[in-house]
Amino acid sequence: MTDRHELILTCPKGLEGLLLEEATALGLEEGREQTSAVRGYGALEVGYRLCLWSRLANRVLLVISRFPTVDAETLYQGVHAVDWAEHLLPSGSLAVEFSGRGSGIDNTHFGALKVKDAIVDRLRSASGERPSIDKLDPDLRVHLRLDKGQAVLSLDLSGHSLHQRGYRLQQGAAPLKENLAAAILIRAGWPRIAAAGGALTDPMCGVGTFLVEGAMMAADIAPNLKRERWGFSAWLGHVPALWNRLHADAQARAEAGLARPPLWIRGYEADPRLIQPGRNNIERAGLSSWIRIYQGDVGSFEPRPDQNQKGLVICNPPYGERLGDEASLLYLYQNLGERLRQACLGWEAAVFTAAPDLGKRMGIRSHKQYAFWNGALPCKLLLIKVELDQFVTGQRAGSTEPQPQQAPVEQARLSEGGQMFANRLQKNLRQLGKWARREGIECYRLYDADMPEYALAVDLYRDWVHVQEYAPPRSIDPDKAQARLLDALAAIPQALGIAREKVVVKRRERQSGTRQYERQASQGEFLEVSEGGVKLLVNLTDYLDTGLFLDHRPLRLRIQREAAGKRFLNLFCYTATATVHAAKGGARSTTSVDLSRTYLDWARRNLSLNGFSDRQRLEQGDVMAWLEADRGEYDLIFIDPPTFSNSKRMEGVFDVQRDHVALLDLAMARLATGGTLYFSNNFRKFVLDASLMDRYAVEEITASTLDEDFRRNPRIHRAWKLQAR
């Protein structure tokens, strides 16, 4: 075999340029970038060195043949032509990886089988023995890539992917691969900072990947020094003496690096469950004397060991996948920016984010941005110099520079639109707050798309804020809509003086007549609120709605006033808040019907919270079917149906516009002489069927069912009072 080989280094998408620089420094010649790979030439020693020292590659492939292929047979013949006895003992084990399509091979599994058959047949024809297949830990891992009729046949020198350094046996929910973390550190300038004796800190360190990779760079430790099993370990072309020399040299460099005074490397993690796994990973990497991890959140991390120390703050904030994450992530970025301005003046910072728009909310400009991919997710690396002239808030360049401990910390400056939104909230709070205090109301709507460009509903639940974003029409640029949402979320805590963690945000789609809302998350946290002398449970996080329809407050209070001594029926009862009011008002009995077991359980809790249980009947069922079967009489009926509903537990689909006549006829058949039925719904295009007025005394009462907080939006619902003629 020649001692000059074609080598292909694979890597995550976006790392090709960095990998080319690294591989060239390690001896690769004539290197050039390909998609998710670097190709070049070098002696076997270069291949070994790349396996040992590359912080960025996934695999090091040694090309043993290139040949044209037009079909499965020419693929087989091209692989069969290789003298496999030079590479693998007939009694050894083999794994084949196949990528690409073409030449009549559109199935990678079929392609891998043809490659395997060719290797096995060649070895068996020479010795009578055949190798076994071991996909997990083979003696030889063969890779074939098919591209535009050209087959590239390689041996995988690395074995398992090189990002698997061996120290990270425990990890968090969404870890960065080690080679991606190393690439981010290199782009952030950590090798330069480390060479100058700088510090490294990660305020959201998870299980410490950035910290370990950074410490290995600073201590001159080869990333795969501790790997015991390689793709070349049982390869017949392996030269142990050459490998042992390179490994011994790397071992000596690591020992010398660790003998130097350690740099100041610290991590902080808010989740206590990740602290010990992170420490275990650090210990496995042999870096316990270099790295410390502490429990702490972004707002309290202390990156500065002394007033003169400078360094790099690096982090990978969570991406956010649940409903309401926009608010928590916005405030996380704001907290990070505040802490950088407060404690890290003169430092550099690197924020790896899948939401670069949130990066703008930190209040510090980034001077460079790099595109990366985390798997299939496009991300940006924001590089920041924590200097006064980079602050979006606080003092500008030319001002007298304070001492580091006096660095200004201010709330993120609001945009012009954000300030207008904040002013509107404060104006509404002055007006509605006075009314709410006078009426003893704890929960009310503060803002309802008063400014068209900020299409939100903002509700107060005691000292919590519940924000619903109306989905923008297709004519609105989604990026502009997202920017306005972030402006609003930045303004709300400042305008209302409410802690950021008490702001919950959700998105509400415009009603189409075909949508209904499902459970959004599962936190199970309930808040007790009061209304009209009753206590009610709301859940601000788990569902699109909270368990309490604020716009129906006047109707619930009317029911409480009229319920004394009456038999009350609540259809589509939801969490039975109207039932609680009826019971409070002295109803002789109550019956509440809903299809959802979850909401009926919630209703039971609402009733129990107020001491009601004996005479309160909760029925699970399809309301239409239940009414057809029921033979009871009721003096007071309340119906607030959804616009649209379907379920496995009901026959057909309920549509309020189509089905309201049948619904009201069934309900009026159950109304006792002299009784009253209240009907309300929130479908904006709803039209009450005129034929109902021929059969019943019908009075629209919408105006009297709107309190001060909903008079700006008189179409929030419509309501009618029905009685027998």
From Swiss-Prot:
It catalyses: guanosine(2445) in 23S rRNA + S-adenosyl-L-methionine = N(2)-methylguanosine(2445) in 23S rRNA + S-adenosyl-L-homocysteine + H(+); guanosine(2069) in 23S rRNA + S-adenosyl-L-methionine = N(2)-methylguanosine(2069) in 23S rRNA + S-adenosyl-L-homocysteine + H(+). Keywords: Cytoplasm, Methyltransferase, RNA-binding, rRNA processing, S-adenosyl-L-methionine, Transferase. InterPro entries: 23SrRNA_methyltr_KL, DNA_methylase_N6_adenine_CS, RlmKL-like_Mtase, RlmL_1st, SAM-dep_methyl-trfase, SAM-dependent_MTases_sf, THUMP_dom. GO terms for cellular component: cytoplasm. Its EC number is 2.1.1.173, 2.1.1.264. This is Ribosomal RNA large subunit methyltransferase K/L. It comes from Stutzerimonas stutzeri (strain A1501). Belongs to the methyltransferase superfamily. RlmKL family. Its main location: cytoplasm. The gene is rlmL. It is an enzyme of class 2 (transferase). It is found in: Cytoplasm. GO terms for molecular function: 23S rRNA (guanine(2445)-N(2))-methyltransferase activity; RNA binding; rRNA (guanine-N7-)-methyltransferase activity. Specifically methylates the guanine in position 2445 (m2G2445) and the guanine in position 2069 (m7G2069) of 23S rRNA. Residues 46-157 form the THUMP domain. SUPFAM superfamilies: S-adenosyl-L-methionine-dependent methyltransferases (SSF53335).
